[in-house]
Amino acid sequence: MGYVVSTFYRFVHLSNYYDIRPVLKEFCVQNNIKGTIILAEQGINATIAGSQNSLDKFFSFLDLDSRLCNLQYHKSFSRCNPFSKMKVKLRKELVCLGIEDFDDSVGGEYIDPENWDNFISRSDVYTIDTRNSYEINFGKFKNSINPETNCFRDFPDWAISWAKNKIDDDPIIAMYCTGGIRCEKSTAFMKDLGFSKVYHLKGGILEYFKSTGNINNLWEGYCFTFDDRIIVDDKLVPGDVKCILCGAHVMLEDMKSISRGHVLCFSCKDHV
């Protein structure tokens, strides 16, 4: 039996997010849904996996709450369930940029996946990857800028430095991330710095793969995922990765550690 992997987020005021946690956890456990859901006063962010029937029930359950109804989600498939358990976490921020004194309510404009290739191929557009270095090491869009960050909280310092040294007075900026949520905040931060022409890939890399299949080959390599698939190609098929210690190929069934993109086989894990 195959599994459906669903990623989604929504920025919405959830004053009772503490109370939502046990309800969602119980529903997911009862319906054999596994993954991670993050709740904050700012909204919800999640990647979950289960049968198609279970996920249909889950989104119907969310529809009962007007704040969470009609969620748009990205869907892919996995031969094995990429999660071992169900976690529902509470956070102060839905996605932590580490900067509080800026207006994060107005982000950049969306670029649909179908129009993304033409947009970033323009000579007057600066394409910025908002992900971390360990993610970018697996793959990226051609000629995109790597901020070389270790975590998302490092992005503001890089952005401030880049703004001071920018080549153009008012550059056109295109930004992207895995599923879109980090761009909601990072584009808002760029606009807060004074940039006016800020855009981002709607739905992120995963939606781009699903919608375009990387038809123009502007994506190079794999996309890192925050689950046991570790990486997927432009057809959303999990790829093979190598153990960082011995170099042996590590298949999905043998995954032992995916901490920050570092993969260990069973043998090496036992000796660390």
Curated annotation (Swiss-Prot):
Coiled coil: none annotated. The active site is at C177 (cysteine persulfide intermediate). GO terms for molecular function: oxidoreductase activity, acting on paired donors, with incorporation or reduction of molecular oxygen. Keywords: Oxidoreductase, tRNA processing. InterPro entries: Rhodanese-like_dom, Rhodanese-like_dom_sf, TrhO, TRHO_N. It catalyses: uridine(34) in tRNA + AH2 + O2 = 5-hydroxyuridine(34) in tRNA + A + H2O. It comes from the Bacteria. The keyword tRNA processing applies. SUPFAM superfamilies: Rhodanese/Cell cycle control phosphatase (SSF52821). Catalyzes oxygen-dependent 5-hydroxyuridine (ho5U) modification at position 34 in tRNAs. This is tRNA uridine(34) hydroxylase. It comes from Ehrlichia ruminantium (strain Welgevonden). The gene is trhO.
